[in-house]
Curated annotation (Swiss-Prot):
A motif ('HIGH' region) lies at residues 13-23. Pfam families: Anticodon_3 (PF19303), tRNA-synt_1g (PF09334), tRNA_bind (PF01588). It comes from the Bacteria. SUPFAM superfamilies: Anticodon-binding domain of a subclass of class I aminoacyl-tRNA synthetases (SSF47323), Methionyl-tRNA synthetase (MetRS), Zn-domain (SSF57770), Nucleic acid-binding proteins (SSF50249), Nucleotidylyl transferase (SSF52374). The keyword tRNA-binding applies. ATP binds at K337. This is Methionine--tRNA ligase. It comes from Ralstonia nicotianae (strain ATCC BAA-1114 / GMI1000) (Ralstonia solanacearum). Zn(2+) binds at C144, C147, C157, C160. Its main location: cytoplasm. The gene is metG. It is an enzyme of class 6 (ligase). One of its GO terms (biological process) is methionyl-tRNA aminoacylation. HAMAP family: Met_tRNA_synth_type1.
Length: 688
């Protein structure tokens, strides 16, 4: 097997919030693959960094009364702690706010400019006259230009699913200051992705992608041969902005989505300086090294269009492949702060749960596709307890004690030629291939089938019975030796997923650190094992319940900690006064939710079937998926606007509107709450 040179990255977490278990899916997926490559003997480097630039970081720092750099330094420490706790083995974890990143961003930009791929244009945007800043899409709210829903963001409507330009919003306001924004023009810098050179390159490059879903999506974005469907990419932002100023353009800054992926290279360049590696030999056009990016499917567009085109035309190698994964749900629903399933990495550790439990469970669910992954908490408990404790660790616990007490910890060398060893070793190529292809769930099914075979062997030999009869001493010695050698081989296969547990196994077995070549070795009587101590405890449901409660309490603490300037809860300004006749036009009715389901293709909408006492049901779409699991709403009473004209939406006809309460600034005061009448109310009652 020839040695490969491999550079691996995961997406960079944004430096204005904590790491949660949804993030951890990606870092665990990447780390398993990286650890496997290292075990195979390949020169592999895994780098990451905090994504530190942009308006949200600048505004959050201002809100906290600190500088952006003070904020990103604190968040970096928190993120690094979380990755260390979950055994994510970065070779270098850095920051996009670095000298290396500034230098590389300027180099890429100037090369693109030299190639004629940078254009300057006037762009009209919303401008906050109070904060004296241009407003990103997500910092503008207003009425949807399609359905009229209030408090919708500047790029899409959570009610009807429409997408639009911020300047299309009706009655817009700044989320930052509350002021009415004005339209203002400024010069912006664009990467000309629509250039025929980019299109030709991308059509060729798309054939290298490993995932059919990614290839199909890219071909959809590229359109048919001869079509011009690619849009140029705005790579600049106006001051004030926390980031890198564009060379030769005072007051203009690189958009965060330009400097963030370049941050992969900046982190690696920093590592190269520490290790004495030749950076250019890894990233130049003619490099023979491999380069892989693990990402979420929501940022596939940036990593399969902009990023490879930027690299290609700035004199760098392009990615060998981009691997995208799906989103995490918990118990079949989107992670929810109100249900306690929006679980932070730190809360998981603080509650006393073993990070390797989650590493194993995610691995048992992960494959090479972009399909979403569900953390079913009951299944999590059952699978960890069954597979890791009941099957894997149980092998050592049932045999090691006899070997230490009766045979000074020394195995019977001759017994290790047992046919069971052949079965375990013959599986190595298949397991290696599955790890390589990121088919972790299939790899673990194979490993657990082998564990079943080993446990069946132990059950047949019954060392606990053999130990009662001195005449069976040799048979006892052989049985325990075979069981522990099989356990060692299983440990090799599980090491990419359970690095901490396997490190303790290596110490207990008194062996060198396991790598893939160790499959061809075996335990030796010349190196006696150490006394056995427990390697892993079972998951207790009380721990999981405590974790959910801790995250519910964290939400409440966040809400309680957001006061207005006068010490009372912050609320948005009251609407203009209306006459009683205006209110009388609105027909509010009590409605019973008789059915509810998530809307395929939307991560915001739920589809509700409502009984409003008419003898028939109504279909209503509501943007409350982030707060409620469908099954939790069925049977509840709520309040709806019953005389709202039906409107055709992307996903079907909506025949009313369910009322829900939320704060004006949902990021500062998270939470979404449907109205629920007291007991005694019945469907069809009018709210007056």
């Amino acid at each position: 097997m020839s040695e490969r040179r491999i550079l691996v990255t995961s997406a960079l977490p944004y430096a204005n919030g904590p790491i949660h278990i949804g993030h951890m899916v990606e870092y665990i997926q990447t780390d398993i693959w990286v650890r496997f490559q290292r075990m195979r003997g390949h020169e592999t480097y895994y780098v990451g960094a905090d994504d530190t630039h942009g308006t949200p970081v600048m505004l959050r720092a201002e809100k906290e009364g600190i500088t952006p750099r003070q904020l990103i330094e604190r968040v970096w420490t928190e993120h690094k702690r979380d990755f260390d706790n979950f055994l994510v083995s970065f070779d270098n974890y850095y920051s996009t706010d670095s000298d290396e990143n500034r230098e590389l961003c300027e180099r890429v930009y100037l090369k693109l400019k030299e190639a004629g791929l940078i254009d300057v244009r006037e762009v009209e945007q919303f401008y906050d006259p109070v904060k004296e800043m241009f407003l990103p899409d997500r910092f503008i709210k207003g009425e949807c230009p399609k359905c009229g829903a209030k408090d919708q963001y500047g790029d899409s409507c959570e009610v009807c699913g429409a997408t639009y330009q911020p300047t299309d919003l009706k009655n817009p306001y700044s989320v930052v200051s509350g002021a009415t924004p004005v339209r203002k023009s400024s010069e912006h810098y664009f990467f000309k992705l629509s250039d025929p050179r980019c299109e030709t390159f991308l059509r060729d490059w798309v054939g290298d992608l490993a995932q059919p879903e990614a290839t199909n999506k890219m071909r959809e974005w590229l359109g048919d041969e001869g079509e011009s469907t690619l849009s140029d990419w705005d790579i600049s932002r106006d001051a004030p902005y926390f980031g890198f100023e564009i060379p030769g353009a005072p007051g203009k800054y690189f958009y965060v989505w330009l400097d963030a992926p370049v941050g992969y290279y900046a982190s690696f360049k920093n590592l190269c300086g520490k290790l004495g590696l030749d950076f250019d030999a890894w990233v130049s056009t003619h490099s023979t090294a491999e380069q892989y990016h693990f990402i979420g499917k929501d940022i596939l567009y940036f990593h399969t269009l902009f990023w490879p085109a930027m690299l290609q035309f700035s004199g760098h190698r392009t990615p060998t492949n981009v691997f995208a994964h799906g989103f995490l749900t918990v118990d079949g629903a989107k992670m929810s702060k109100s249900r306690g399933t929006f679980i932070t990495a730190q809360s998981y550790i603080d509650t006393g749960l073993n990070p390797e439990w989650l590493r194993y469970y995610f691995a048992a669910k992960l494959n090479a596709t972009m399909e979403d992954l569900d953390l079913n908490l009951d299944d999590f408990i059952a699978r960890v307890n069954s597979d890791l404790v009941g099957k894997f660790v149980n092998i050592a616990s049932r045999s090691a004690g006899f070997l230490v007490k009766r045979f000074e910890g020394r195995v019977n060398d001759a017994a290790l030629a047992n046919p069971l060893m052949v079965q375990l070793r013959e599986a190595a190529p298949q397991i290696a291939d599955l790890y390589e292809k990121r088919e972790y769930s299939k790899a673990l099914r194979t490993v657990m089938e082998l564990a079943d075979a080993v446990n069946a062997y132990v059950d047949t030999e019954k060392p606990w019975d053999l130990a009662k009869d001195e005449a069976q001493r040799d048979k006892l010695h052989a049985a325990c030796s075979v069981a522990l050698e099989a356990f060692r081989l299983l440990a090799v296969y599980l090491k990419p997923i359970l690095p901490s547990t396997v490190a303790r196994i290596e110490a207990f077995l008194n062996i060198e650190p396991l790598n893939w070549r160790a499959i061809d070795a075996q335990l030796s009587s010349a190196r006696p094992i150490q006394p056995y101590s427990h390697l892993m405890t079972r998951v207790d449901k009380k721990q999981v319940d405590a974790l959910l409660e801790a995250n519910r309490q964290s939400l409440q603490a966040t809400v309680d900690a957001v006061p207005a300037a006068n010490g009372t809860p912050a609320v948005e300004p009251m609407a203009e006064t209306i006459a009683i006749d205006d209110f009388a036009k609105i027909d509010l009715r009590v409605a019973k939710i008789v059915a509810c389901q998530r809307v395929e293709g939307s991560n915001k909408l739920l589809q509700l079937t409502l009984d409003v006492g008419e003898g028939k049901t109504r279909n209503v779409f509501s943007g409350i998926q982030s707060a409620y699991a469908p099954e939790d709403l069925v049977g509840k009473l709520t309040v709806m606007v019953a005389n709202l004209a039906p409107r055709k939406m992307k996903f079907g006809m909506s025949e009313g509107m369910v009322l829900a309460a939320s704060a004006a600034d949902e990021k500062a005061q998270p939470g979404l709450y449907i109205l629920e009448p007291h007991a005694g109310a019945v469907p069809g009652m009018r709210v007056r």
